[in-house]
Swiss-Prot record:
Species name: Arabidopsis thaliana
Keyword terms, alphabetized: Cell adhesion, Cell membrane, Cytoplasm, Endocytosis, Endosome, ER-Golgi transport, Guanine-nucleotide releasing factor, Membrane, Protein transport, Transport
Compartments in which it is found: Cytoplasm, Cytosol; Endosome membrane; Cell membrane
The protein's name: ARF guanine-nucleotide exchange factor GNOM
UniProt GO molecular function: guanyl-nucleotide exchange factor activity; identical protein binding; protein homodimerization activity
Pfam families given in the database record: Sec7, Sec7-like_HUS, TPR_28
UniProt-listed SUPFAM superfamilies: ARM repeat (SSF48371), Sec7 domain (SSF48425)
Gene name of the encoded protein: GN
Length: 1451
């Protein structure tokens, strides 16, 4: 039952005893010699004394003194012992020495040497629990030493004896056989030591220190065994009766009581037995009499005596610990708010006691929780004293109190939830803020203690989970984190150690959160909490407080409710009715109010206006009365004095002033109190009357306006016969009277200002609550609640660390701040708190202000010399690279830093590179070419000029070089070092990674980065802008294009913004410049690179190139050649990916523009040739567009006739693809689709021949003639194309007849501009003849054949009459009749031209000969001799009727 296990050994604390193996005779002999030596030493000292030495010199035959006889007898025996030493009873060889010690005839020197002998024997390690008769021997040693008597001859020898006594008692406790000591003996040892400690205050310094050290070692030795002690819950709980705690302390059934020390003169006899503390059973507590005052014994029960005589264990430890706690009670004047400065006593005794208590807790550790009485002492009496001494003026005491609480937190926090809350609220927060009068030293100690707690990884999490998320507890985490943040701020003062200390605490909390992130995801759904309906929540418990799957969601919900309740309390304080309505609307009160829920709201919600609560509870309304009764029912008044219960009740609201309201309130209180504590009071009426009487006494005693105060007798007399007609016990009423007189009941409690004072009634309430409070939640190493916690503290924390960083001057402080910033960034990113990360970036960017070129003369050197700016810069870009996914508006500030570095020329040469397909942009590209890695330079250079001093090494070389105008001195070593530091800083930033790795950014972050680049570039203005602004805009545009190209898979996300930005630049620029250069060619690069990957966006990408078509003429002309090259590249690389007509229209438009540009036309034509020559990239969608583009090149005089002829060949050769498409359509399509396709192909063919028709009018003879040949080829090679009959009619009207007419007109009027028109006309008339004959069969089917035939004849007739250079053409005169004759023969052969033709009757026949006669009169006779004579008369008729043009046209 709570005893030490015999097998556990003593944990030595101080000296290692000599080790002897007593298994052989030689060792037995050795030990015998040692004991003989000690006997000799004692006898020698005794002989020196006159009293003892004279007996040997006497001649009388007197017997020797019994002390000497026993020593000599031992001397005779000791060498005769041959058995193993452990079988010899220690009493045999200890008794003679102990007799000397106990004798009152021996002086101090003799007693001292005897004590030394016992000490040596105990330290020989020859005695253990297995030694014979060891129990009696150990008891004898303790009894003898604690009963030591000796004559005091001088103070020094007295102190030596006392020190020897301490040595022997400590050796007893450290000996392996100490387990055989009883609880009573252990208490006696401790009491004896304490008496020496107490007396040492009046003696030498050395004795004081030795006594205290021994006391300390004793406590350590005793409590080091607690982990080895069997659990004692059952044994101790089953003891008689229950432990009452009404006096806020554990009243032991046995206690150490001390007797006073009587001071004697130098020759007086010293009696340790009478001067030491003696053991007494009973309930007389040292709390009342003090550890050094007289104590009265009371008879001990047989059970108590039984416990105390058993081998020592928990009972003695409980007694000792209770004794140590009681030492704190004798100095209550050191209490809260005390300003006494009697440090000598105020510090000495409490410090001594606190040190001993701390040692006991350190060694007992978590084992204490298994022993209810020890735990109860700590929960109540110890913690109450700690709360008191925590507000001591002494920093030493405060420091020790904080150390004890930290140890208790480590070992017993699950049992001390509310005690810890009270300590932080009433002590740490109060002192650390420094607002309520503590000294700077107190404030510093409190802050150090808080920081120590923050360094415990789970401390803040557990405070948040157990207290902040408990509706009935204060927000300790929130208050502590706010305190740390505020204490970090230097307000109108330089940075001090206190600020750095608070910073350390803040960083410790943040880094704890960051470390938990590394421990893996929680796997829990931690989304926002909502309340959809009211459910009673005040007394709800979690299903399992040890399983995160249960408690995490539970406490988050409780915190949400608590936060909403705070808002509700604020509404209630402004208007109680609207406040309750608000709570109903947020489902914190039921839709129909019930008394219990409103009562709980009043009872457990912090921050309520207590005046309003009191008025509500005192109201006569029936509902309010019900609420009052329910409110009283929430209190636990069991085992509580009436005045304590009343104090507790009235602290929760302000007692109304009206008597009726007071009556109602006290009635509710009295009924509840009587229900729970009916021991003394006869009925609830007695409780009511007495409560009224207490209120009246309180007013009488503490109202300054009352001159004549009520006496104790008056109070007792006033309360006669109130207890059911009988009197209450006088002692009971007297106790009430003095309690009220000494401690006022505050009926007007303070409204939440400042920190609560831990009054006795509040402490009793806390102890009652602690029995019912929710279990303490132990947090593991995962980030269950960090999101919610960090959201609370992030803002103040960033501000606090930033202020310290701003004010700091030492690099170690800088590094601490940087560690904090990086931890904040990590947490923000992990929990997706984008706003927090943005705030952090904004704060950090402020510290790079030295990068601003205007702030200093040599910004690069200044940057290199400024450690703070360099560290901040590295941190910003570390955050951007690591946590860029969660940066939003912060990109603007980051870009601001990048632009500052860019303006100084400090950026590495590849920041703006798109890091993809670099081979695409080689150094061979000429002037005006957009280079992917053309990087920011400090100053704009003219186009094509090599950039000097762009980038960091350029700046460095500038520093090293000699200026041509003003020679510079060589840079100093400091300047070189500063430049080297700058170089290293920029390298560590990895700025280029932000953009090259942008493909890994989350979509929203990427979009914000792009927007930030557009914003940073600024809006281009029409007209001239400063070179610096343009350089910035160019740099931003390069970066924007780089991230666009790096994010081709997400181009849809970026495209709108990128396009609009480039469009703004293109449309606002009226002169060639670097910015529009980057914009145009950046756009072309984007299209080139993205078309293969985003066919769905191809039309939009290509449509964007229309911006190039809209460029100002001067700009377009300057870049036309390069545009052509880029478009040509685009076409060659992506022709397969351009499918739509709209896309090709843009491309061909761009190519067509180049046709007339001297430098650009070659590239443009190259692209057109690429598309049309092989035909692999020619589609129905782009056919007409490509033909038109080729026509532009054919008509262009740039590139000589050869290129025009090549263009005509492209047009002519394209006919075969029409035939292929027609054949493919016929084979693969249905009838309907084929018909539509044939129609489309016919339209394409018509557009082809119309295009060729236009080129047939070219001034250049070879081009013109080649065009006619190509036209003839295209008109004649239509066999594979299914042209509709009507198409030929259009063809003759719009193409063939038109080109013949136009050429005829040119021949007639523009002879000077057109050379050798005769050959062209000849080709044209041959074209007409050939096409007509080839298509005669088709044409003859037309209803308009007559009209078409008339057109042919008319043109032939005109060409016969045409004059070239003033005379008729011989070639035409010769060719036209021949061609006509050929036509007529074919028509005759095919039956088209007959005298009575079915197609046109006589009119076609007559019409034909009318015109033929004008060309060749003899042809009719030659071709139709048989019909000549019969038709002579008819010719005249026809001639008369159809000779006019109107009639001719009408036919």
């Amino acid at each position: 039952m709570g005893r030490l296990k015999l097998h556990s050994g003593i944990k030595a604390i101080e000296e290692e005893p000599e080790d002897f193996e007593c298994t052989d005779s030689s060792n037995t002999t050795t030990l015998a010699c040692m004991i003989d030596t000690e006997i000799a030493a004692v006898l020698a000292v005794m002989r020196r004394n006159v009293r003892w030495g004279g007996r040997y010199m006497s001649g009388d035959d007197q017997l020797e003194h019994s002390l000497i006889q026993s020593l000599k007898a031992l001397r005779k025996q000791v060498f005769s012992w041959n058995q193993p030493w452990h079988t010899i009873s220690p009493m045999l060889y200890l008794q003679p020495f102990l007799d000397v010690i106990r004798s009152d005839e021996t002086g101090a020197p003799i007693t001292s040497i005897a004590l030394s002998s016992v000490y040596k024997i105990l330290n020989l390690n020859v005695i253990d629990q297995n030694t014979a008769n060891i129990e009696d021997a150990m008891h004898l040693v303790v009894d003898s030493v604690t009963s030591c008597r000796f004559e005091v001859t001088d103070p020094a020898s007295e102190e030596v004896v006392l020190m020897k006594i301490l040595q022997v008692l400590l050796a007893c406790m450290k000996n392996k056989a100490s387990v055989m000591l009883s609880n009573q003996h252990v208490c006696t040892v401790v009491n004896t030591c304490f008496r020496v400690v107490h007396q040492a205050g009046m003696k030498g310094e050395l004795l004081q220190r030795v006594a205290r050290h021994t006391m300390h070692e004793l406590v350590r030795c005793i409590f080091s065994h607690l982990p080895d002690v069997e659990r004692t819950e059952t044994t101790l709980v089953n003891r008689a009766g229950s432990i009452k705690q009404e006096k806020a302390g554990v009243d032991s059934d046995y206690a150490i009581v001390s007797k006073p020390v009587e001071d004697g003169n130098a020759n007086s006899e010293y009696d340790v037995e009478n001067s030491m503390a003696t053991f007494a059973t009973g309930a007389q507590s040292l709390m009342d009499d003090g550890p050094v005052g007289p104590g009265s014994r009371k008879p001990a029960s047989p059970y108590d005596l039984h416990i105390m005589t058993e081998p020592y264990g928990v009972p003695s430890m409980v007694e000792i610990f209770h004794f140590l706690c009681s030492l704190l009670n004798v100095v209550e004047h050191v209490g809260m708010g005390s300003r006494s400065n009697t440090i000598a006593f105020d510090e000495d005794v409490p410090l001594f006691a606190l040190n001993l208590i701390n040692s006991a807790i350190e060694l007992g550790g978590s084992s204490i929780r298994h022993h209810p009485r020890l735990l109860s002492l700590i929960q109540d009496e110890l913690f109450r004293n700690l709360m008191q001494f925590g507000l001591s003026m002494s920093p030493l005491i405060l420091s020790m109190v904080c150390s004890i609480v930290l140890n208790l937190y480590q070992h017993l926090r699950t049992e001390l939830k509310l005690q810890l809350e009270a300590f932080f609220s009433c002590v740490i927060l109060r002192l650390a803020q420094g607002k309520y009068g503590p000294s700077y030293q107190q404030q510093e100690v409190a802050m150090e203690a808080l920081v120590n707690f923050c360094r415990q990884k789970s401390f803040m999490v557990e405070m948040y989970a157990n207290l902040d998320c408990d509706i009935t507890c204060s927000n300790v985490f929130e208050e502590l984190s706010n305190l740390l943040s505020k204490s970090t701020f230097p307000v109108n003062c330089p940075l001090s150690a206190m600020h750095i200390l608070a910073l350390d605490g803040l960083i410790a909390v943040i880094q704890g959160m960051a470390e938990r992130i590394s421990n893996g995801l929680t796997g829990l759904d931690l989304g926002p909490v909502h309340l959809d309906e009211y459910t009673p929540f005040w007394m709800v418990k979690c299903d399992n407080y040890s399983d995160p799957n249960h408690w995490v969601s539970f406490v988050r919900r409780r915190k949400y409710i608590k936060r909403r309740l705070m808002i509700g309390a604020d509404h209630f304080n402004r208007d109680p009715k609207k406040g309750l309505e608000f709570l109903q609307g947020t489902h914190l009160l039921p839709d129909k109010l019930d008394p219990q829920s409103v009562a709980c709201f009043f009872r457990y919600t912090a921050g309520l206006d207590k005046n309003l609560v009191g008025d509500f509870l005192g109201n006569h309304d029936e509902f309010c009365v019900q609420v009052l009764n329910e409110f009283a029912g929430t209190f636990d008044f069991q085992y509580m004095n009436l005045d304590t219960a009343l104090r507790l009740f009235l602290e929760t609201f302000r007692l109304p002033g009206e008597s009726q309201k007071i009556q109602r309130v006290l009635e509710a209180f009295s009924e509840r109190y009587y229900m729970q504590s009916p021991e003394i009071l006869a009925n609830k009426d007695a409780a009511l009357v007495l409560s009224y009487s207490i209120i009246m006494l309180n007013t009488d005693q503490h109202n300054v306006q009352v001159k004549k105060k009520m006496t104790e007798e008056d109070f007792i007399r006033n309360n006669r016969h109130i207890n059911g007609g009988n009197d209450l016990p006088r002692e009971f009423l007297s106790e009430l009277f003095h309690s009220i007189c000494n401690n006022e009941i505050r009926t007007t409690p303070e409204q939440g200002a400042g920190f609560p004072e831990m009054t006795p009634s509040r402490w009793i309430d806390l102890m009652h609550k602690s029995k019912k409070t929710a279990p303490y939640i132990l947090a593991d190493s995962r980030a269950y609640l960090d999101h919610d916690m960090f959201a609370i503290m992030s803002g103040p924390t960033i501000a606090a660390i930033s202020v310290v960083f701003d004010h700091a001057e030492h690099e170690d402080v800088y590094q601490t701040c940087i560690d904090g910033f990086l931890a904040i960034a990590k947490i923000s990113a992990c929990h997706h708190l984008e706003d927090v990360l943005d705030d952090l970036v904004v704060s950090l960017c402020k510290f790079t202000t030295l990068l601003n070129p205007s702030s200093v003369d040599e910004p690069v050197l200044a940057f290199g010399d400024d450690a703070k700016a360099r560290m901040a810069t590295i941190t910003i870009f570390t955050i951007a690279n690591k946590y860029g996914d969660y940066i939003r508006t912060g990109w603007r500030n980051i870009l601001d830093c990048i632009l500052r570095l860019h303006k100084l020329g400090l950026l590495p040469a590849r920041v703006a590179s798109d890091a993809a397909d670099e081979s695409e942009h080689s150094s061979e590209q000429g002037q005006g070419k957009p280079l992917a890695n053309s990087l920011s330079s400090a100053h704009l250079q003219s186009m094509g000029t090599p950039r000097r001093s762009s980038g960091l090494m350029g700046r460095f070389s500038q520093l090293l070089s000699l200026d041509t105008e003003e020679p510079r001195s060589q840079p100093t070593e400091q300047q070189l070092a500063a430049h080297q530091r700058t170089l290293q800083t920029i390298q560590k930033c990895h700025i280029d990674s932000i953009f090259t790795e942008s493909k890994f950014l989350q979509a929203e972050s990427l979009l914000q980065l792009a927007r930030a680049l557009i914003w940073a570039a600024g809006r281009p203005q029409k007209g001239t802008s400063s070179p610096e602004d343009e350089d910035t805009a160019v740099f931003c545009l390069e970066l924007l294009i780089a991230i666009t190209l790096n994010n081709r898979d997400r181009i849809v996300l970026l495209w709108q913004g990128v396009y609009e930005h480039i469009a703004t630049i293109a449309q606002s620029t009226v002169m060639p410049c670097n910015l529009v250069d980057k914009a145009i060619f950046g756009l072309l690069r984007i299209c080139q690179r993205l078309l293969p990957y985003k066919e769905s966006l191809a039309d939009e990408l290509l449509r964007s190139l229309q911006l190039v078509l809209k460029l100002d003429a001067r700009v377009a002309d300057a870049y036309c050649e390069q545009i052509a090259i880029e478009v040509s590249r685009l076409v060659k690389a992506n022709a397969n990916h351009i499918r739509s007509q709209a896309g090709w229209r843009t491309i061909t438009s761009l190519l067509s523009i180049t046709a007339r540009h001297p430098e650009a036309s070659e590239s443009g034509f190259d692209a057109v040739s690429f598309v049309m020559s092989e035909g692999t990239h020619l589609y129905p969608a782009n056919y007409v567009l490509c033909v038109d583009a080729a026509r532009q090149f054919a008509e262009s005089r740039v590139g000589q006739s050869e290129r025009s002829i090549r263009a005509l060949d492209l047009m002519g050769d394209s006919l075969e693809f029409l035939a292929k498409w027609a054949l493919s359509a016929k084979e693969n399509m249905g009838e309907e689709d084929f018909g539509k396709m044939s129609q489309d192909i016919g339209e394409m063919w018509l557009r082809l021949v119309q295009g060729l028709r236009k080129v047939c009018l070219d001034q250049r003879e070879d081009v013109r003639n080649h065009a006619l040949q190509s036209l003839q080829k295209c008109l004649g090679g239509v066999d594979g194309i299914n042209l509709a009959h009507s198409m030929w009619s259009q063809c003759f009207d719009k193409v063939i007849f038109t080109v013949l007419d136009d050429l005829l007109e040119i021949a007639a009027g523009s002879q000077k501009d057109y050379r050798n028109m005769e050959g062209t006309l000849l080709l044209a008339i041959k074209l007409l003849s050939k096409v007509f004959l080839q298509q005669l069969q088709e044409l003859s089917q037309l209803s308009t054949f007559c009209k078409l035939w008339l057109g042919v004849l008319t043109r032939m007739e005109k060409y016969m009459k045409v004059k070239v250079r003033g005379k008729k053409s011989d070639k035409l005169q010769e060719s036209v009749p021949e061609l006509l004759k050929n036509i007529l023969l074919v028509m005759k052969t095919k039956g088209v031209l007959l005298q009575r033709s079915a197609l046109g009757g006589d009119s076609l026949w007559e019409l034909t000969w009318l015109h033929v006669n004008n060309i060749a009169p003899s042809m009719r006779l030659e071709l139709f001799p048989d019909q000549e004579s019969s038709q002579l008369g008819d010719d005249e008729t026809v001639s008369n009727g159809l000779s006019s043009p109107e009639n001719t046209t009408g036919s």
